[in-house]
Amino acid sequence: MLYSRESRTTVLFLALVTSLTVLCHSVDVTTVFTTSTITEITTVTAAPQPQNKAETALNTATNIIQTMQFLFNCAPFKWKGPLKITSCALNFIVLLLTAWGYLLKYLQENKLNSDADMEKMVGLGFGEMVGRIFGKGVGKAFTKMDITQKLVYPFEGSNRQKCLLMTVGENSIVPFHDLFTEICFDQYTLDSLSHHNHGSISILDAGSVSALGFADISSKMPSVSELYTLFGDYTIEVLGGITKLASTLNREDWQGERNGFAVLSRDRPNQTLLSVHMYSSSLL
């Protein structure tokens, strides 16, 4: 069975092996201290350190493995209390945004710049898409999430906005069935978001972990570090939005509302770099 100890060990081992081939992520050092809320984070940035490819690959493998562990821990019969539920919802949203970010990064690195290229990747399905980016062993595990995807174009134009719609199916191990996630962006989004101020988020203190709602995650927070790889100096805004959405999904009436957040450009206040919304099919 999927949730047996042997199955989990096998999947995590496959994730480690396949993820060790990923050598493209930067490893810098920044320490982040927080007080009680996410908006009060102060970043102390260290000078850039020489990239160590072996360390980079190991860090990436660790982050992927931890995300996979959350999938197992969030199975409905393992939920224990509202904090646990909030943590599962939060990690689910982190997973979707991380997968989306790595999709754009994969397309850029392989010079697949057309809408058709993106549609082809999205058409593979969530698990197969993840497998194409990180390796088949990882993708097979993520297939159990039973997520379907499609691209839509709400506005016409040469640089038109795109929205990735991700739908959780009835057979998903994530208990948010009939949930639609809408991630809207344009072709410049990743470049705009991923600006780095010479470092990466690597450490959060225990108090900040509780403030973010990560009730059962190590204070080192590799998932947050992975988000910083994609969202750079906008990570704080993204985390704030993720926390808001996680709290919404923790309410029994979440199906009756359309909730989300937008990340605005700091250079062009009227420009939306990224928007994320979650809602039930009943609101379509």
From Swiss-Prot:
Q: Name one GO cellular component term.
A: plasma membrane
Q: Which residues lie on this side of the membrane: Cytoplasmic?
A: 25-84
Primary localisation category:
membrane
Q: How does it sit in the membrane?
A: Single-pass membrane protein
Bilayer-spanning residue ranges: 85-104
Where is this protein found?
Cell membrane
Keyword terms of this UniProt record: Cell membrane, Glycoprotein, Membrane, Signal, Transmembrane, Transmembrane helix
Ranges in the topological domain labelled Extracellular:
105-284
Residues bearing carbohydrate:
N270
Q: Which residues does UniProt assign to the signal peptide?
A: 1-24
Q: What else is known?
A: Present with 396 molecules/cell in log phase SD medium.
Family to which the UniProt record says this protein belongs: To yeast YNL019c.
* Name the UniProt record assigns to this protein: Uncharacterized membrane protein YNL033W
- Species this chain originates from: Saccharomyces cerevisiae (strain ATCC 204508 / S288c) (Baker's yeast)
